[in-house]
Amino acid sequence: MIKKLTTAILALFSISVMASAEVINVKPPKGDATQVLNAALRKASKAKGPVEIRLAPGTYNLSKEKSLVRYYRVSNTASETEHKTADKHIGLLLKNLKHVTINGDGKATLLTHGEMTPWVIDSCTDIRLTGLTVDAADPSVPEMTVIERTDNSILAKVNERSRYEIRDGKLYWKGFGWEFTDGIAQLFSPAKGTNLRCNSPVALAVKVEEVTPGTLRFSYSGNAPACAPGETFQMRHAIRSEVAGLVNRSTDVTLSGIRFKFMGNFGVVSQLSKKITIEKITCWADSATNRTAVGFADFFQVSSCGGLVRFDNCRFGSAHDDPINIHGTHLKITEINGNKLTARYMHHQTFGFLGFTEGDTVSVTDPATLLPVGYFVVGSARMTDERNTEITMEGFRPVEGAKVPASLKGMIVENRTWCPTVSITNSYFSLIPTRGILVTTWRPVVIRDNRFVKCPMAAILIADDGRSWFESGAVENVTISGNVFEQCSNPVISIAPENVLSDAGYVHRNITVTDNTFISDRPVRIGVRSVDGFTFSGNRARTISGTPQELLFDISSSANVTLGQNR
């Protein structure tokens, strides 16, 4: 039986050799494609040079029950209490590979069945995924569109890809191996061009009835949730048990020309990796299925990476959190003995991976002021459990003029080696419930020639904190130029480190905002806090009709601020 199965798998791909690379041609099987695709990857691992795996047009079904199960702790995902295991159910596992391209030529679809991780790139070099569509047969963000609303009821049509069951008057959303009720909700309004968080129409209902198959009536003891006919409720649970893709401890990875129709149960996460290129990506709802939601949370999370992280020519719409979030991680020093310290992951959703290696440069920072008190080089590092890392310090150097405490216990540490240079260009952000971009890295950041439409929070947020999300760190060189901000909430750009203000110094430095256009029906606000060196010049503020709009600035605890000629 095994021999017959192997023969059947081999029949679905062929191998040819070109001048530049070996080519493995793969055809979509009738059933699950997991074995076929991973057999091609095993073939690629034996090649002596570059390999291109070409996927023939069609749908490649990836089912959770046939998936490869591997243990991965991933930044900003489910905690130990939210989800007991870190097992990921993986469709394609790229492990210890070099110089491999997977090319769908724009006509191959990876279709997941069940909550799972479509692909993982782990400990690889020079990997390229291109020309693919990624979707789910059972999206874990069910949807229903409002037909009618009365004072105390809603009549809604369930999307064709959303399955449900009513038990004892309660609605349960269902998929392959998953179900939930109540949950978190957003409301997509095609008339307003918004996709905003709201109260769950399921959680508030006292009764749910099936009027006809796929048509539900929700009854409420008080007022029905605000909505209008034609608007769509998007609902989800909050457990980030899987991701839409993982780049782990890899170098030179490119995602190009990929259409994400659904990303669950979190976005694509890159962690402890270098040189990441994300280009020509489309995260946009599939009109063919009348769906309106693409993301379960963030689209792209970049955590503790290095080298150049580049986003270019992407289109982002219908997320359930930030499209792009780039940050490091602060760990808290809980024990110190001589030159050995224990650093602990503090946020419940980020832990379980070793974030330090020999030779890395680490900053020691006061969590209240977010100002560094010193630096050291890692002599050795090992995890004693999934929360705690034992680090040997070499050559601690105090920051000149800093108040170094008698004990470093209670301070926070950031790995300065694993902080990327960032470029985000020529991209479009719309139908977002939160921010467009959140970025914190000390290396240069360029955000240029993008368009942000109706972000209900800051279109661009530069934060840094050591007591809530523990997402680091301070920026030192940021350029925001040539962008268009259309009807975004205030402050449109927010520099907002979560520090206790101190006369000791400023958290962020050298932020330049030039040649941008702000379009708004109300005065435009820019928020600046704890920055040394902020320049805002050559920008334009307009009303929707094109007349001049007022520019307002909320500036506190900052120095060397230049507000040049803006119009």
Annotate each predicted stretch with a short phrase.
Residues 136-138, 159-211, 351-386:
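Ser/Thr/Gly-rich low-complexity blocks that favor extended beta-strand/coil architectures
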Residues 42-43, 61-101, 111-130, 138-155, ...:
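Extracellular beta-strand-rich solenoid/capping regions of secreted or surface-exposed proteins
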Residues 51-53, 60, 92, 100, ...:
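Solenoid scaffold repeats with emphasis on beta-solenoid/beta-helix
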Residues 25-54:
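Acidic Gly/Asp/Thr-rich repetitive segments characteristic of extracellular carbohydrate-active
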Residues 195-241, 375, 382-422, 430:
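Small/polar beta-strand repeat architecture
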Residues 7-16:
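Bacterial N-terminal signal peptides
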